[in-house]
Regions:
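Conserved C-terminal helix/tail region of periplasmic/extracytoplasmic solute-binding proteins
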Residues: 319, 323-346
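Secondary-structure end/capping motifs
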Residues: 254-328
Length: 346
């Protein structure tokens, strides 16, 4: 208990930056007379009860890929899933650490933080959201490449967290000094960024989905997406991917219920593909579960990069991304990069 409390306290600090049942005993038998040995019918071993997997997700892009599983859980009690949805990571992760949840979707860097804090108590099952950051321009048409950002001011959110580190990485890999060649003006909320653009009549912003869609709704057709940070990362990332979120499983649960984990991976792969192929219906489910408002979700889903990347491909994508974060700020990933055991199935 002391260890758990310690872990939870450390986790809270970090977030400020950003039955093994045996078979029943065989009944005693009396030896049959040697003259009439009747053959006994074989007895079947008892079947283990199905495991109900407790899922957890946050509102926003990290939860979008799971909405089909949530709906299935509501419609069919035998689906094998129950779920919890929270508004922030610091509401969700304590439930995982206290073994109230089994599998959760969390920001990628937080996954590494939790691995370090729990000393390997969690493992990454899949990357489920790639980059959701976009650079947009309002009132002008000057930007068509990263190089065009030189000398410009970029309004953004996420100072001291992954959005800043992702932007700095892309700028640096394209030959720009983030501290000299551009001005990054950080605001506390996306709404502040929109307000500044509206007041000035023009400007450049880096925002995550679905806030980009929401901003376009307020600023109109003169607000246009010019660059995808995820796509620009892929051009220079040497095999790594701009990773927003991944799916974690408690190590103990994975060891005790490997079949349930494999079933989940299969079900989630289907669910993620379903979301991308059924945007209208998926958008309605996002609204139902209060992940993202339905009208916004329907426009944002195609740009949220919902995926299911597992195994060695996951390790390359996620591991490379965590390396980028580690090089800029080790605390962003919990002080150390995860060990090989972090990557399930790799």
């Amino acid at each position: 208990m002391k260890k758990l409390i310690s872990v939870l306290c450390l986790l809270a600090l970090t977030l400020s930056m950003l039955s093994g049942c045996g078979a029943p005993a065989a009944p005693e038998t009396t030896a049959a007379p040697e003259t009439t040995a009747a053959a006994e019918a074989p007895t079947e071993a008892p079947t283990a009860a199905p495991v109900s997997v407790r899922l957890g997700a946050m509102t926003g892009p990290t939860g979008i890929g799971m909405v089909k599983l949530f709906e299935d859980a509501d419609q069919d009690a035998a689906s094998g899933y129950s779920y919890t949805i929270k508004g922030a990571a610091d509401e969700l992760t304590p439930m995982l650490l206290q073994e109230e949840l089994d599998i959760v979707s969390v920001p990628a860097n937080l996954a590494s933080v939790l691995y370090n804090k729990t000393e390997g108590g969690v493992r990454a099952l899949a990357v489920n959201v790639l980059g959701v950051l976009y650079i947009a321009e309002f009132g002008s048409d000057d930007v068509s490449s990263v190089a065009d950002l030189k000398g410009k001011t970029i309004y953004a959110t996420g100072k001291g967290s992954t959005p800043e580190y992702f932007l700095r990485y892309v700028l640096t890999r394209n030959g720009l000094d983030p501290d000299k060649d551009v001005t990054i003006d950080f605001k506390s909320e996306p709404s502040e960024v929109v307000a500044v653009l509206n007041a000035e009549g023009s400007g450049i912003a880096m925002l995550p989905q679905p806030y980009v869609i929401a901003a376009a709704g307020q600023l109109g057709e003169n607000f246009k997406i010019k660059l995808s940070v995820s796509e620009e990362w892929e051009k220079v990332g040497a095999g790594s991917l701009c990773t927003t979120a991944c799916i974690l499983v408690r190590t103990k649960f994975a060891e005790e219920h490997p079949e349930a984990v494999e079933k989940f991976l299969s079900d989630f792969a289907f669910a993620a593909a379903w979301v991308n192929e059924n945007v209208e219906e998926a958008g309605e489910l996002c609204g139902k579960f209060e992940i993202v408002k339905a009208p916004v979700a329907k426009k944002a889903i195609p740009k949220c990069n919902i995926v299911c990347i597992t195994g060695s491909e996951m390790r390359s994508a996620l591991g490379g991304c965590l390396q980028v974060l580690f090089e800029q700020n080790p605390k962003a990933v919990g002080g150390n990069l995860p060990g090989d055991d972090f990557y399930y199935g790799a």
